[in-house]
Amino acid sequence: MVKISVIGSGGWGIALAILLHKNGHNLTIWSFDKKEAEELKINRQNKTKLPNILLPEDIKVTDNLKEAVDNKDILVLAVPSKAIRSVSKSLKDIIKDNQIIVNVAKGLEEDTLKTMTDIIEEELKEKNPQVAVLSGPSHAEEVGKGIPTTCVVSAHNKELTLYLQNIFMNPSFRVYTSPDMIGVEIGGALKNVIALAAGIADGLNYGDNTKAALITRGIKEISSLGVAMGGEQSTFYGLTGLGDLIVTCASMHSRNRRAGILLGQGKTLDEAIKEVNMVVEGIYSAKSALMAAKKYNVEIPIIEQVNAVLFENKNAAEAVNELMIRDKKLEIQSW
C-alpha cells in the first residue's frame, strides 16, 4: 500500500484522492482552509466544488501541512497554479529528500513563464525531488464518478513515469506515458485560454461552425507557441493538447468555458469570476501566453483577442469580428 497525500481539497484533488483510494492506496487530503477541512471531515464532500461525491471514511483530512506530508511516498499537488510557488516554499523544510511530487495544476507563471514543475523544482532544489506531471481531458466531476477517462503522465525519467502510470491507472482511468514534460504542461495551460474564447462565442450565441474554427485554429496557436517553448509538436495533437482542448471547449463542467460564456453575454471579468465561483485558470494563463508569444515571436491572434476582452474591456463581438477580417492566410504553411 502506497502512502499518498493530495495537497489541495478542491474538486480535482478530491476526485484524484477517491481514484487513488480505489486503487488500494492510503490517502490523506490537505486543505489550506481549516473550515473547509472540518466540513470535509464531517460531511465527506466539498459541497461547493464537487457536490454529491463522497470521500470514503478512511481517507484522512487535515489542515496541517507537516502532518499531511510526513512519511508519504507520493505528494500530489492539486492546488491552483497561482499557489504552486507558495505551497512549494511551504514544503521546503518538511519533505524528505527525493520526494516524489506529481503536479496536476495547469498554468504558466505570469512573470517568469515557468511551468508548474519548473517552479516546484526551483523551490525544492535542495531536496532534489522527483517531479512529474499528470494532465489530460479529465473533469473532476466525471473522474469522481468513475466515468472512463484518459490522461498522460510525464517525468524526467522513464522509470518514474512507468511507476506513476501504475499508481494512477485503473479500469476507469487509463494513463498513457510521455517523455515530453514541457509539451504536456504547456498544452494543459494554453487550452484554458482557447476555452475562454469558445465560451465567449457561446455567450454570443454563435454556432458550431464558430466553435470548430476556434478549436482548430486554437490548437494551431497552442502548438506553434508550445514548440517555440520547447515542446514536441506531436504532444499538442494528443490527449494533453487537442484532447484537453476539446473537452474544455465543449463541456459545461469547464469553468473556463463558463467564464467565457458570461463574458460573451456582456458580464465584466469580475462578475464572471464571481459567478463561476471557482478558479478560472485561463485568465492567468492568457497573460502568460501573450508574454511568451512576444518573447518567441509567435503569432497567436485568438489568444491576443482573449486578452483584449479580459483586460482591456474590449467588446466580445468586436474581438470575433477582428479575427474574421484579418489578412488572408494559408491554412497550413506548406506551399
UniProtKB/Swiss-Prot annotation:
Gene3D superfamilies the UniProt entry points to: N-(1-d-carboxylethyl)-l-norvaline Dehydrogenase, domain 2, NAD(P)-binding Rossmann-like Domain
UniProt-recorded name of the protein: Glycerol-3-phosphate dehydrogenase [NAD(P)+]
Residues that bind sn-glycerol 3-phosphate: 106, 136, 138, 191, 244, 254-256
Family annotation (Pfam families): NAD_Gly3P_dh_C (PF07479), NAD_Gly3P_dh_N (PF01210)
Binding site for NADPH: 12, 106, 140, 255, 279, 281
Record localization: Cytoplasm
Keywords linked to the UniProt accession: Cytoplasm, Lipid biosynthesis, Lipid metabolism, NAD, NADP, Nucleotide-binding, Oxidoreductase, Phospholipid biosynthesis, Phospholipid metabolism
Protein family membership: Belongs to the NAD-dependent glycerol-3-phosphate dehydrogenase family.
Molecular function (Gene Ontology), one example: glycerol-3-phosphate dehydrogenase [NAD(P)+] activity
Chief location category: cytoplasm
InterPro entries the UniProt entry points to: 6-PGluconate_DH-like_C_sf, 6PGD_dom2, G3P_DH_NAD-dep, G3P_DH_NAD-dep_C, G3P_DH_NAD-dep_N, NAD(P)-bd_dom_sf
Gene name, Swiss-Prot/TrEMBL: gpsA
Signal peptide feature range: none
GO biological process: carbohydrate metabolic process; glycerol-3-phosphate biosynthetic process; glycerol-3-phosphate catabolic process; glycerol-3-phosphate metabolic process; glycerophospholipid metabolic process; phospholipid biosynthetic process
Pathway where this protein functions: Membrane lipid metabolism; glycerophospholipid metabolism
Catalytic residues as annotated in Swiss-Prot or TrEMBL: 191
NCBIfam families: PRK00094.1-2, PRK00094.1-3, PRK00094.1-4
Reaction catalysis annotation: sn-glycerol 3-phosphate + NAD(+) = dihydroxyacetone phosphate + NADH + H(+); sn-glycerol 3-phosphate + NADP(+) = dihydroxyacetone phosphate + NADPH + H(+)
Enzyme nomenclature, EC number: 1.1.1.94
Keyword match DNA-binding: no
Task of the protein: Catalyzes the reduction of the glycolytic intermediate dihydroxyacetone phosphate (DHAP) to sn-glycerol 3-phosphate (G3P), the key precursor for phospholipid synthesis.
SUPFAM superfamilies, per the entry: 6-phosphogluconate dehydrogenase C-terminal domain-like (SSF48179), NAD(P)-binding Rossmann-fold domains (SSF51735)
A cellular-component GO term for this protein: cytosol
